[in-house]
UniProtKB/Swiss-Prot annotation:
This is Replication factor C small subunit. It comes from the Archaea. It comes from Sulfurisphaera tokodaii (strain DSM 16993 / JCM 10545 / NBRC 100140 / 7) (Sulfolobus tokodaii). GO terms for cellular component: DNA replication factor C complex. It holds the Pfam family Rep_fac_C. The lineage of its organism: Archaea, Thermoproteota, Thermoprotei, Sulfolobales, Sulfolobaceae. GO terms for biological process: DNA repair; DNA-templated DNA replication.
Length: 327
């Protein structure tokens, strides 16, 4: 296998410049102004995983400094290095030296900054103030609420949102064609439905599914170790039709054959109930979603998976008798 084949597609197809980023248009336009002015404040990128926070930061520094941007740029993952020592040593050592060239500052990217301890964030705040003449900080986080207020007030906030379905599917199709991989359109849509706007995860699933020669819905679910949607729907309908014992047998089959956890199955049940493949009244959907949420909570709190899922199937049978009888 060649080195190129070993490269993760998520990295191979990561945009290198702000001009290459096709989503988050408002954010990109604001960042381009910083490049034009060769000046910017400290930045705080907030949003779900896979929405382009790190990509935008890397593209920004590339456009600021050119191909040699690495000598003006320090990237740290706060998940791995979350303590005060990192701030005192690595960041301070980098920040205290003056940048050369046309841009009068260097850039530090702290990815997953919401994983930093409160003390480390306080140390970071002081470092940001001390070296503001020579260094700009970009903090990327999934949860804005975990960033202390003194840092939030010293940064310009950029909110990244989950990518639209058409953008993700189009990007997956482009990558598949470029890699000469056959695919079904439905499979790409399924990848989006599973990843919900997380581009990095979507591309990783596409690459993993490509080993089957053609990316199909079946290949996607096989790669993820999830049950086929039609099997989940069959179990749901058996329960709604009052056939609790057969529904329970199907559940047991799914648990054994796929090695799924209760959390995996409950998420798939939720996806099918809220989708369009199962034809049930909206008022019943509301009740089911509410109860599914209760069961998921109990499972996450440590209750026995199979007992809770059996209770859910029993509830489906009761609701089916009440809402679907005679239909």
């Amino acid at each position: 296998m060649s080195l190129e084949e070993e490269i993760l597609w998520a990295e191979k197809y990561r945009p290198r410049s702000l001009d290459d980023i096709v989503n988050q248009k408002d954010i990109v336009e604001r960042l381009k102004r910083f490049v034009k002015d060769k000046n910017m404040p400290h930045l705080l990128f907030s949003g779900p995983p896979g929405t382009g926070k790190t990509t935008a930061a890397l593209a920004l520094v590339h456009d600021l400094y050119g191909d040699n941007y690495r000598q003006y740029f320090l990237e740290l993952n706060a998940s791995d290095e979350r303590g005060i020592d990192v701030i005192r040593n690595k960041v301070k050592e980098f920040a205290r030296t003056v940048a050369g060239g046309n841009v009068p500052f260097k850039v530090v990217l702290l990815d997953e900054a919401d994983n930093m301890t409160a003390d480390a964030q306080q140390a970071l705040r002081r470092t940001m103030e001390l070296y503001t003449e020579t260094t700009r900080f970009i903090l990327a986080c999934n949860y804005l609420s975990k960033i202390i207020e003194p840092i939030q007030s010293r940064t310009a906030l950029f909110r990244f949102y989950p990518l639209k379905k058409e953008d993700v599917v189009a990007r997956l199709a482009y990558i598949a064609k470029n890699e000469k991989v056959e695919y079904d359109q439905k499979a790409l849509e399924t990848i989006y439905d599973i990843t919900q706007g997380d581009m990095r995860k979507a591309i990783n699933i596409l690459q993993a599914s490509s080993v089957y020669g053609k990316v199909t819905v079946e290949a996607v679910y096989k790669v993820l170790g999830l049950a086929q949607p039609k099997e989940i729907r069959e179990m749901i309908m058996l329960a709604l039709q009052g056939n609790f014992l057969k529904a329970r047998e199907k559940l047991r089959e799914l648990l054994v054959n796929y090695g799924l956890s209760g959390e995996d199955i409950i998420k798939q049940i939720h996806r099918e109930v809220t989708g369009n493949e199962i034809n049930i009244p909206d008022d019943l959907k509301v009740l089911l979603v509410d109860y599914i949420g209760e069961v998921e909570y109990r499972i996450m709190e440590g209750a026995d998976d199979e007992i809770q899922l059996n209770a859910l199937l029993a509830k489906l049978a009761v609701y089916g008798e009440k809402y679907l009888k005679g239909k």
